[in-house]
Amino acid sequence: MNIHEYQGKALLKSFGAPVAEGVPVFKASEAEAAARALPGPLYVVKSQIHAGGRGKGKFKELSPDAKGGVRLAKSVADVVANANEMLGHTLVTKQTGPAGKQVNRLYIEDGADIERELYLSILVDRSVGRIAFVVSTEGGMDIEAVAHDTPEKVITVAIDPERGVTADDVKKLNAALKLDGDAAKDGGTLFPILYKAFIEKDMSLLEVNPLIVMKNGRLRVLDAKVSFDNNALFRHPDVLELRDTTEEDEKEIEASKYDLAYVALDGNIGCMVNGAGLAMATMDIIKLYGAEPANFLDVGGGASKEKVTAAFKIITKDPAVKGILINIFGGIMKCDIIAEGVIAAVKEVGLEVPLVVRLEGTNAELGKKIINDSGLNVVSADDLDDAAKKIVAAVKG
């Protein structure tokens, strides 16, 4: 689960992290009071959407030369003007896709005297089986591009879970970020704070980009991207209250009601698979044959007929889907259950796109018979390779 920047900063502030003063705004009429509540004279007006690249983004409704989703304002009147221009409009960034996201919230923040911009994140490093800091002196930039072009500028420091952030870890992080004086002292305080927040709130990602060194030599968290482990949210009702479902894909919200692992993608071939590994292999082979998957959907090992029906309906709700591939290897999951669920869904919502089904394993022959006897226009496949070829050919015509 993701939260907005202003929510992430409030959370980090509650742990003792240094963040700028700011006020969230939901209506343009609130912008003036928000700005007057801050010291000024410089303000930053930030679009609050669950996507990166806001500063370089463009609003659909505005002219191409209009400012992006993060704007510097030099007066209260300037804050108000920007709020009126940004709220309710659609911001397109490199992470939103061409559809963009509507800006329904702004964060009016006090300006900062920036000396240097740094990058810091905390994540689960599966290569070493530990939580790790990833830092770079190249902050405020696309960290993926930095890692690709100059990998030596991205430093990873893994943390021993039994010891937490040690003095030696702090020394390594300060050296990697080239911090000294007051900034190094602040690092000695900040790094353990961020690690504590990550652990106690069951985060999956904490990204500060940029972490700044101000002209007075002190550190400040200037941006915060926070993601939480969905499987641990039951332990954090306070975090669940921060959820903004308007920022989430409607199909993903619906899938979560049925405990379906669903992720919307940008392609046009819908996928229903059992098992995450098989689902990824299915998406890979679709791409291999020149098409793009519209989703990741794992119905799991013990799905019921109702769950399969719900999964199929979620796939068909996506207007981008031009074909559907069902790939089931029956173990715990029985192929006849899949067949019954698909037939029930088709009878309810109809079938207007090609459907290719590959069933293998427990009750596979029974599942195939159920589908064949249904009278549905379904193409059977012998194996995964055959299934991928058939659905790609059907979609491409």
UniProtKB/Swiss-Prot annotation:
Cofactor note: Binds 1 Mg(2+) ion per subunit.
Domain of life of the native organism: Bacteria
Catalytic reactions of this protein: succinate + ATP + CoA = succinyl-CoA + ADP + phosphate; GTP + succinate + CoA = succinyl-CoA + GDP + phosphate
Record-linked SUPFAM superfamilies: Glutathione synthetase ATP-binding domain-like, Succinyl-CoA synthetase domains
Gene Ontology MF annotations: ATP binding; magnesium ion binding; succinate-CoA ligase (ADP-forming) activity; succinate-CoA ligase (GDP-forming) activity
Keywords: ATP-binding, Ligase, Magnesium, Metal-binding, Nucleotide-binding, Tricarboxylic acid cycle
Binding site for ATP: K46, G53, R54, G55, E109, A112, E117
SS bond partners: none
A cellular component annotation (GO) from this entry: cytosol
Pathway in which the depicted protein is active: Carbohydrate metabolism; tricarboxylic acid cycle; succinate from succinyl-CoA (ligase route): step 1/1
Cofactor(s) of this protein: Mg(2+)
Record has ATP-binding as a keyword: yes
Assembly notes: Heterotetramer of two alpha and two beta subunits.
Function description: Succinyl-CoA synthetase functions in the citric acid cycle (TCA), coupling the hydrolysis of succinyl-CoA to the synthesis of either ATP or GTP and thus represents the only step of substrate-level phosphorylation in the TCA. The beta subunit provides nucleotide specificity of the enzyme and binds the substrate succinate, while the binding sites for coenzyme A and phosphate are found in the alpha subunit.
Protein name: Succinate--CoA ligase [ADP-forming] subunit beta
Organism whose genome encodes this protein: Mesorhizobium japonicum (strain LMG 29417 / CECT 9101 / MAFF 303099)
